[in-house]
């Protein structure tokens, strides 16, 4: 058994190495899965090798090493290795399917080795354990669907910037793997064919695994060619060439310049344009290659040979991926490296390049996130070299002798109001050290900078003529600086008390005029509102109404005029002459100069005054004290109970009430203000009778005599004497209007006979004129010549107020001679004078005694169309038999309307 064990162990090692090397993921797969990039919150550092061969060969430290290895295995791959001397060893391996290992055979081999003593064949066992740890380093851990390759210290496949950020402590600003390789090859410079003779790919892969696992000891490497292959592998696996793709075309153009000076200038500009990490790595590589070239007598590696080897590695054509197609560019690529090596001092020893190189060596300080203490800057005082040796602390860490009597100077801050808050009174120096090393700034509280809450106390002047308040009982020192900062410094000997959040109230200094007196604390809603001063009294009424509120839509109809009640001493009778010709615009009404209310009531619709009208107002008006706008002077009540209008053309109120006609038309838009009072006075009267274009006019007034009108002959009549027509016929467009007549006793008796004022002129003016019932002429009536009106059957003719549709509703009557009773010869159409001006509907009464009485009011008869046609035909036939008409005897042609009217009346 013991003789067969070594072959099985050897076979197991060989099988493991064979499968492991074949199944390792390629570099492209690792880069695609973003495996080699360390997390951002981790700042790893190069550690010494954990798996040294001496530790495995040492029996005393074997158990301790195994326990540490087991912990690492549990953290990385959830694998457990239990191994102890003199006891059975059970080995459970996970993720074996990823590497296609022979688990069953390995388990059988492990079961066979349970009875083997630890002292036998320790070299093979320790080697197996060592290789197994390397296997765990590159084993896969599956988290859901993501496969993570655990790499302790990745070196290959990372860009120079990533390597500098991951390993800030690396010497010379280059990865430590290059540093170790350069150190090893510097001892074997006389070896012939360095970088030209390839190394073993198997050895290069094992070295790469070993380096990324943390073992950088090359003392056991016997072949320098393997180290040269390791350097070439490092540059070949970079994500981009050391001279990036963006600079490839510029580099190729340099080779076509044709002179040494142009080569140097072009290459110098190319080097300065490279990223800092690439510049640092390129210079260190070229320095080492020049060292190799110095031993070219032994190693046979000249500049031409080196440039051919590294030209393809450091420069790659971005347009050609296939290496066979890029053979044409090999000469240009090698020429660039050749010129860099030949003119190294002229390129890299220039001042600008040296300055850029020095900047590239010093990387940015990484933040150690391995502990939560990085959130508290007070924890980093003197313990970490990156914080204890910063230039800021070296500048502000003064000696005890200089800090004894010198006022501390706060560090430069931004213009924002900030304060220094000491998180912990840590002191890393002796007893005389004044400053704490760790402070954190944050925005100052509003409590210290709001003068309305707490006033700024004036600084007390001391004998040292500074603005510092020095006390012996406290350890806080307040410094007034121009940028409004407050620095709190902690001294060492006295115990630092807790900061007092409530500042003391100091009495104000009356001699210091720049600081205001202390104000009481702010109270919410205690500022009274400023009273609104009353407006100045206006002397004119026009200024009071210059800006009225906008008109609002009416919410309720305006009250009718019938609801007005007569008031004593406030009855107003507007005068047309005074209202139109008055130039005095001054009023002394008390309501015009009253103090405006907080919210005045909305104006009425009938009382809105347009601001564009600047017509003066009659001072004789008695304006109601409740409103500031005058009431429209439409009509007023007098003591006699009648209604008098302001002008000759005002309509009769009773007729308006009988016809249910509104005073102001509501057909307009709702927001249009009603007409003004003086506009109503000047406007034409509201007529209810349309104009008849033909020779007959339907009049609403009684007969008019031919005597000249006189103002004394017209007087208003009481409204109770006005005849009211009820049961008016419904007008129709298609049918003729009904005829109201009393001339035919067979049809109806005691009915009204609406007649027209026959405006005919006679040759003789000796006829006795009759006194009219009412003489109310419009402006156009003065041009009408004297007319002769006849009375028929002593009946008063009056008409009702027709609607606009009943334009043809006419009642015709033929005038007769008062002496003979015969019909008067009607004049011709040329002699007939027609008044086209509508007469206003007025209520009239006789001015003198008249035997005529008011007729009785009854419902008029309505004749249908067929009845009127039959009646007209019958009357016309009878009349034709009795009095045949002829055109002789001085009579002119009679109009058909007069003939029809004559026949009907007969």
UniProtKB/Swiss-Prot annotation:
Entry's Gene Ontology cellular component terms: cytoplasm; plasma membrane
Keyword Nucleotide-binding: no
PANTHER family: RHO GTPASE-ACTIVATING PROTEIN GACJ (PTHR23176:SF127), RHO/RAC/CDC GTPASE-ACTIVATING PROTEIN (PTHR23176)
UniProt biased composition (Polar residues): 381-404, 565-574, 637-649, 880-890
Top-level taxonomic group: Eukaryota
Positions of the record's site feature: Arginine finger: 196
Disulfide topology: none
Ranges of compositional bias, category Low complexity: 69-79, 461-487, 575-597, 613-629, 650-663, 683-694, 754-772, 785-816, 844-861
Alphabetized UniProt keyword annotations: Cytoplasm, GTPase activation
Any Pfam family hit: RhoGAP
Transmembrane region(s): none
Region (Disordered): 53-117, 368-415, 452-864, 877-906
UniProt cross-references to SUPFAM superfamilies, sorted A to Z: GTPase activation domain, GAP (SSF48350)
Compositionally biased spans, kind Basic and acidic residues: 92-117
PROSITE patterns to which the protein is assigned, alphabetical: RHOGAP
InterPro entries linked: Rho-GAP, Rho_GTPase_activation_prot, RhoGAP_dom
Any one Gene Ontology BP term: small GTPase-mediated signal transduction
Protein name: Rho GTPase-activating protein gacJ
GO MF entries: GTPase activator activity
Function of the molecule: Rho GTPase-activating protein involved in the signal transduction pathway.
Record-annotated Rho-GAP domain positions: 161-348
Intracellular or extracellular location(s): Cytoplasm
Pro residues: bias regions: 494-510, 547-560, 708-721
């Amino acid at each position: 058994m013991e003789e067969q064990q070594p072959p099985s162990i050897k076979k197991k090692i060989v099988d493991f190495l064979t499968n492991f090397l074949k199944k390792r993921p390629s570099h492209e797969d690792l880069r695609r899965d973003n495996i080699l990039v360390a997390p951002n919150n981790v700042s790893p550092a190069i550690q010494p090798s954990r798996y040294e061969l001496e530790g495995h060969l040492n029996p005393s430290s074997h158990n301790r090493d195994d326990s540490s290895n087991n912990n690492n295995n549990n953290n990385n791959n959830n694998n457990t290795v239990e191994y102890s001397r003199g006891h059975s060893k059970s080995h459970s391996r996970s993720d074996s399917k990823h590497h296609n290992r022979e688990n069953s055979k390995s388990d059988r081999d492990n079961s066979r080795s349970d009875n083997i003593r630890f002292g036998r064949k320790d070299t093979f066992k320790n080697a197996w354990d060592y290789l197994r740890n390397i296997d765990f380093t590159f084993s896969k851990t599956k988290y859901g669907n993501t496969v993570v390759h655990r790499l302790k210290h990745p070196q290959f496949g990372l860009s120079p910037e990533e390597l500098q950020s991951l390993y800030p402590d690396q010497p010379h600003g280059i990865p430590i793997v290059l540093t170790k390789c350069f150190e090893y090859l510097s001892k074997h410079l006389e070896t012939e064919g360095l970088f030209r003779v390839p190394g073993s790919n198997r050895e290069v892969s094992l070295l790469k695994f070993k380096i990324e696992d943390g073992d950088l000891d090359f003392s056991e490497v016997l072949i320098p060619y393997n180290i040269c292959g390791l350097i070439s592998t490092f540059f070949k696996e970079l994500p981009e060439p050391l001279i990036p793709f963006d600079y490839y075309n510029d580099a190729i153009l340099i080779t076509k310049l044709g002179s040494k000076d142009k080569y140097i200038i072009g290459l110098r500009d190319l080097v300065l344009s490279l990223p800092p990490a690439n510049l640092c790595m390129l210079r260190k590589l070229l320095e080492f290659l020049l060292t190799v070239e110095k031993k070219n007598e032994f190693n046979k590696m000249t500049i031409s040979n080196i440039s051919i080897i590294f030209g393809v590695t450091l420069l790659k054509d971005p347009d050609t991926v296939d290496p066979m197609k890029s053979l044409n560019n090999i000469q240009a690529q090698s020429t660039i490296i050749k010129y860099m090596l030949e003119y190294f001092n002229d390129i890299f020893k220039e001042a600008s390049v040296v300055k850029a190189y020095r900047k590239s060596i010093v990387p940015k300080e990484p933040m150690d996130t391995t502990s939560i203490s990085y959130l508290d800057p007070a924890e980093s005082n003197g313990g970490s070299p990156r914080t204890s040796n910063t230039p800021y602390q070296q500048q502000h860490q003064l000696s005890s002798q200089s800090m004894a009597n010198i006022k501390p100077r706060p560090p430069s801050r931004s213009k924002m109001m900030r304060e220094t808050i000491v998180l912990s009174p840590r002191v890393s120096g002796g007893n005389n050290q004044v400053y704490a090393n760790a402070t954190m700034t944050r925005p100052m509280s509003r409590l210290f900078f709001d003068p309305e809450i707490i006033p700024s106390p004036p600084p007390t002047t001391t004998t040292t003529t500074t603005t510092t308040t020095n006390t012996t009982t406290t350890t806080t020192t307040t410094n007034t600086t121009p940028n409004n900062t407050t620095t709190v410094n902690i001294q060492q000997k006295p115990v630092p008390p807790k900061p007092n959040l409530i500042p003391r109230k100091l009495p104000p200094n009356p001699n210091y005029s720049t600081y205001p007196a202390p104000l009481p604390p702010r109270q919410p809603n205690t500022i009274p509102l400023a009273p609104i001063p009353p407006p100045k009294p206006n002397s004119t009424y026009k200024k009071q109404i210059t800006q009225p509120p906008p008109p609002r839509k009416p919410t309720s109809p305006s009250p009718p005029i019938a609801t007005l009640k007569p008031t004593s001493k406030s009855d107003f009778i507007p005068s047309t002459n005074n209202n139109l010709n008055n130039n005095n615009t001054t009023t002394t009404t008390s309501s015009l100069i009253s103090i405006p209310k907080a919210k005045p009531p909305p104006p009425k619709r009938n009382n809105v005054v347009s601001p564009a009208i600047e017509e003066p107002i009659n001072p004789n008006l008695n304006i109601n004290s409740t409103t500031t706008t005058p009431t429209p002077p439409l009509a007023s009540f007098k003591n006699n109970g009648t209604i008098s209008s302001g002008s000759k053309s005002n309509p009769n109120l009773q007729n308006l009430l009988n016809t249910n006609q509104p005073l102001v038309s509501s057909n307009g838009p709702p927001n249009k203000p009603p007409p003004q009072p003086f506009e109503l006075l000047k406007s034409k009267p509201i007529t209810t009778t349309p104009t008849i274009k033909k020779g007959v006019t339907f009049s609403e007034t009684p007969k008019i005599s031919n005597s000249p009108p006189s103002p004394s002959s017209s007087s208003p009549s009481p409204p109770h004497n006005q005849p009211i027509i009820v049961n008016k016929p419904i007008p129709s467009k298609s049918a003729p209007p009904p005829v109201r007549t009393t001339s035919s006793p067979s049809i109806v008796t005691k009915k009204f006979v609406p007649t027209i004022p026959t405006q005919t002129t006679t040759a003789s003016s000796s006829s006795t004129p009759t006194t009219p019932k009412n003489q109310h002429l419009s402006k156009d009536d003065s041009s009408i010549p004297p007319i002769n009106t006849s009375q028929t059957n002593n009946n008063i003719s009056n008409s009702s107020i027709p609607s606009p549709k009943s334009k043809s509703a006419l009642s015709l009557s033929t005038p007769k001679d008062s002496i003979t009773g015969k019909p008067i010869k009607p004049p011709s159409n040329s002699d007939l004078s027609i008044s086209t001006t509508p007469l206003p509907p007025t209520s009239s009464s006789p001015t003198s005694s008249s035997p005529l009485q008011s007729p009785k009011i009854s419902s008029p008869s309505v004749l249908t169309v067929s009845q009127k046609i039959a009646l007209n035909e019958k009357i016309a036939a009878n009349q034709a038999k009795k009095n045949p008409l002829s055109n002789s005897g001085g009579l002119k042609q009679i109009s058909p309307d007069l003939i029809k009217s004559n026949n009907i009346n007969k």
